[in-house]
């Protein structure tokens, strides 16, 4: 059979997590319109007859403004050392810019290493929102950006394939998946057929809490929020929400606790029946800049 690992790489907000969920056919990674929603290397497993592909959703590559941001970039680039194929995701509704070129350069550099195998696939996402002339322009820009990286990586560049897709509607996703599977090496199944993700349950619950907070958060809050499960004794789950300032604590709790109640209700609806979820908010100043805080949070 064919099997292997596939990195989904891109700058923030191009739809990487939505694409992973569309490929696997179920929700394994949280999504949000906020940049840098993904902080962990979430893995989704696709099972097909004679093939198994393990897709890794990576944090968005960006110019970091915090220690956390630097670690997220390191996590994304570090993933490239351990995969067979890279799917670089671009946004069809926005011009190919410096951030996209950084993504493509990182992918091509990793795939040009002597032991690299499967190559580069470029997914131009948000097909459903792009005008036809926009899509043609974006595909042309993507091809030109990859071709500009040919020095020292001619084989990678020549073998690159480009796919217009919509992670929201599913258009073009099957073609992308078939191209991924065709590039995987011969190998064993890494996960049993019933498994679609290997994300630990405690992290998955904490991420669901953060996802619901991002839906309700004001502009200044998303990057200041972290969530961690501190106690798990089923059915009781205790999740701690970290913010950086006292004023943010009040926003997260809401008037009369309305925000926290809404978050808890939305998350419980996604957990197994009987789960008792407790949410607590704690102020930890400058946690994004403190290595010890990031270590404790698993970042």
Question: Where does each model-flagged region fall?
Answer:
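Conserved, well-folded catalytic cores of nucleic-acid-processing
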Residues: 26, 45, 49, 79-86, ...
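Catalytic P-loop NTPase motifs of RecA-like helicase/translocase cores
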Residues: 38, 62-63, 95-96, 130-131, ...
């Amino acid at each position: 059979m064919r099997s292997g690992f596939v990195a989904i790489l891109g700058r923030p907000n191009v739809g990487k997590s939505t694409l992973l969920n569309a490929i696997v056919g179920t929700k394994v990674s949280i999504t949000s319109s906020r940049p840098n929603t993904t902080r962990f290397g979430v893995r989704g497993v696709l099972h097909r007859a004679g093939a198994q592909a393990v897709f890794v959703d990576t944090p968005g590559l960006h110019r970091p403004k915090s220690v956390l941001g630097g670690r997220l970039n390191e996590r994304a680039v570090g993933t490239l050392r351990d995969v067979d194929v890279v799917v670089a995701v671009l946004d069809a509704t926005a011009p190919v810019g410096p951030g996209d070129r950084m993504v493509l350069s990182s992918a091509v550099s990793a795939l040009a290493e002597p032991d690299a195998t499967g190559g580069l696939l470029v997914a131009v996402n948000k097909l459903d929102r792009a005008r036809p002339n926009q899509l043609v322009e974006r595909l042309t820009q993507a091809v030109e950006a990859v071709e500009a990286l040919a020095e020292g990586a001619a084989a990678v560049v020549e073998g690159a394939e480009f796919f217009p897709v919509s992670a929201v509607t599913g258009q073009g996703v099957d073609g992308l998946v078939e191209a991924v599977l065709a590039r995987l090496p011969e190998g064993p199944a890494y996960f049993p057929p019933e498994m679609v993700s290997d994300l630990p349950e405690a992290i998955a619950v904490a991420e669901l809490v953060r996802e619901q907070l991002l839906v309700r958060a004001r502009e200044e809050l998303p990057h200041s929020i972290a969530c961690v499960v501190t106690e798990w004794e089923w059915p009781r789950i205790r999740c701690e929400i970290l913010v950086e300032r006292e004023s943010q604590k009040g926003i997260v709790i809401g008037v009369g606790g309305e925000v926290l109640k809404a978050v808890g209700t939305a998350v419980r609806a996604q957990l197994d029946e009987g789960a008792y979820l407790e949410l607590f908010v704690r102020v930890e100043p400058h946690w994004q800049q403190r290595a010890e805080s990031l270590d404790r949070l698993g970042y």
